[in-house]
């Protein structure tokens, strides 16, 4: 993960006795000079802060009143929740409870919490109490430092997945949780330290300055410092879940053609997208266009002729958008140059902005077989998901950068041995070869070497997909398969016609004699061709339900099923 945002608490974290530590202020300015965004996130009111912050502005945004008020440079304050309920304020006054009010927050001594709870219950108000050391704050439900920070970053066009938060007290829990790394200071709340990703050592705000400068020296947060966010790979034979920490690592997914490797990679993408990571997916064959069914995903066709690369670069820089770059319509000979251009662009953007968070390269052996141009693959930044069926054709530098290896079925001995050579822990080559060849279509194995696998292989059943998946859907709709894999329509053993694409089959069905259609259906020929040549098990199952039915109904059902799946007219 490339740091892009620094979210800092005020009292007890960067400030003591109402004043920001001078060394922390210098470190914050140094971070801004490098392009890091800095956000102050505090329970204090803006008027209170204005009396204590002096000199040039240190922050790109201030989230005040524990997430309820936002200030951006050159703009008036923005309230992110409604103001205090007048009935609530009246009851506080009637009971003589000392308090201070901001634009949205009501602040009081923590000792009066029981009385305030009784007032909230009696008035049936949707209010929450947050404690901060010896004080408490009352705000509407759902308002906290995390919600305020997320609003600030949305307006700054930045992501919590590039953010590091530092805090010291009870009201910092949500902020540390929502950021990619949450750091608690060693001199603060014990409960916060227990839940934090890491601890800032030291005994006062000056230590935060050292922590900031250490971050500035890093192009990427090391994977071992990141482990909270995970994706589900699947389940073991005993039903135990197997998870993989995201950690910004480069992950290699290898396996034979039609073995389920794109399905596996797609499952990882779905989970990352739903955790609001921004992905850039280089999709040579249209395998991942189905991800557009998920929120925040856009499929962008790249054919090299009508592609606006300037507009595409703007899309890539959006922190809340995942892109599937569909190259299936590009001429095969043009794809290496197109992918190289795209990789150079996306790698530069990741260095500059921290997004996209992850880059998937399918059929990676075609595009990363040599690293003559270091801009094609950022070895230092990492964060790639590489999918390949020819591990032997990948650059050795790319292979060495892989930090977790997932394998679907492999029958090719040479490819299997190359995969096994990447990791320790396989007792004998014969044992590893047997394992990889024995995997079912819905199984995979996490090879030894990663933190999660330890020193042994972890075999698992792949987690279900959320979006429908069709292997090479766009390619096989229009691009002819080899002659030896075409569908031959026959009657009494004599050929009547041929189909080399899905659209050929769809166009031929209305013209075929009923007995030819019924014969192929009864023998399961259509289903086997769809499953074995195209690897489309879902459509194959739909066709199975038509086998043995009335010819006219079956023909119409077959045409509808294909048209719904691949596009085109069913009638």
Predicted regions and their residues:
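Conserved ATP-driven motor cores of ASCE-family P-loop NTPases powering translocation/secretion/packaging/pilus
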Residues: 383, 390-452
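P-loop NTPase catalytic phosphate-binding loop
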Residues: 227-358, 367-385, 389-393, 398-401, ...
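Walker B catalytic acidic pair
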Residues: 10, 284, 362-364
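Alpha-helical substrate-recognition element adjacent to the catalytic core
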Residues: 1-82, 105-106
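Terminal, compositionally biased segments used for targeting/anchoring and flexible tails
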Residues: 431-571
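HAD-like small-molecule phosphatases
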Residues: 50-154
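Mg2+-dependent phosphoryl-transfer enzymes with acidic/Ser/Thr/Gly-rich catalytic loops
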Residues: 1-3, 21, 139, 146-227
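Short, well-ordered beta-strand core segments
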Residues: 31, 62, 182-184, 199, ...
């Amino acid at each position: 993960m490339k740091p892009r945002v620094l979210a800092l608490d005020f009292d007890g974290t960067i400030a003591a006795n109402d004043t920001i530590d001078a060394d922390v202020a210098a470190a914050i300015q140094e971070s801004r000079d490098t392009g890091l965004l800095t956000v102050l996130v505090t329970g204090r009111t803006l008027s209170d802060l204005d009396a204590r912050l002096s000199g040039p502005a240190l922050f790109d945004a201030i989230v005040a009143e524990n997430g309820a008020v936002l200030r951006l440079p050159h703009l008036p304050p923005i309230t992110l929740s409604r103001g205090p309920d007048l009935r609530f304020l009246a009851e506080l006054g009637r009971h003589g409870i000392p308090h201070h009010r901001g634009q949205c927050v009501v602040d009081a001594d923590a000792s009066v919490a029981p009385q305030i709870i009784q007032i909230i219950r009696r008035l049936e108000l949707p209010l929450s109490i947050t404690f901060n050391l010896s004080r408490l704050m009352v705000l509407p439900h759902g308002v906290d430092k995390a919600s305020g920070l997320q609003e600030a970053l949305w307006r700054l066009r930045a992501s919590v997945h590039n953010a590091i938060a530092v805090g010291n007290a009870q009201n910092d829990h949500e902020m540390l949780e929502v950021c990619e790394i949450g750091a608690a200071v060693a001199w603060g709340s014990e409960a916060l330290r227990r839940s934090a990703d890491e601890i800032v050592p030291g005994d006062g705000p000056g230590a935060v300055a050292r922590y900031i400068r250490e971050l500035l020296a890093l192009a990427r947060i090391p994977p071992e410092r990141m482990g909270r966010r995970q994706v589900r790979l699947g389940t073991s034979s005993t039903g135990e879940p197997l998870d993989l920490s995201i950690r910004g690592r480069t992950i290699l997914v290898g396996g034979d053609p039609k073995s389920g490797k794109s399905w596996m990679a797609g499952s990882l993408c779905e989970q990352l997208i739903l955790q609001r990571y921004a992905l850039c997916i280089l999709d040579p064959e249209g395998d991942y266009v189905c991800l557009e069914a998920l929120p925040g995903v856009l499929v962008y066709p790249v054919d090299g002729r009508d592609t606006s690369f300037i507009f595409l670069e703007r899309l890539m820089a959006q922190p809340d958008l995942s892109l599937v770059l569909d190259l299936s319509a590009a001429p095969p000979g043009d794809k290496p140059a197109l992918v190289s251009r795209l990789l150079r662009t996306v790698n530069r953007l990741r260095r500059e902005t921290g997004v996209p968070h992850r880059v998937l390269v399918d059929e990676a052996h075609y595009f990363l077989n040599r690293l003559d141009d270091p801009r094609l693959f950022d070895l230092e930044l990492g964060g790639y998901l590489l999918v390949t069926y020819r591990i032997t054709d990948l650059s050795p530098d790319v292979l060495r950068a892989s930090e977790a290896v997932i394998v679907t079925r492999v029958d090719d001995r040479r490819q299997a041995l190359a995969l096994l050579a990447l990791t320790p822990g396989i007792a004998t080559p014969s044992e590893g070869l047997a394992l990889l060849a024995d995997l079912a279509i819905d199984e995979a194995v996490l090879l030894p070497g990663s933190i999660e696998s330890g020193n042994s292989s972890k075999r698992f059943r792949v987690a279900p997909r959320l979006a429908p998946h069709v292997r090479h859907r766009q390619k096989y709709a229009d691009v002819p398969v080899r002659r030896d894999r075409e569908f031959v329509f026959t009657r009494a053993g004599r050929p009547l016609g041929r189909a080399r694409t899905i659209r050929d089959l769809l166009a031929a069905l209305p013209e075929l004699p009923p007995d030819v259609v019924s014969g192929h259906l009864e023998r399961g020929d259509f289903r086997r061709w769809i499953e074995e040549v195209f690897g489309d098990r879902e459509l194959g199952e739909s066709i199975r339900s038509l086998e043995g039915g009335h010819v006219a109904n079956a023909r119409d059902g077959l045409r509808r099923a294909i048209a719904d799946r691949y596009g085109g007219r069913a009638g």
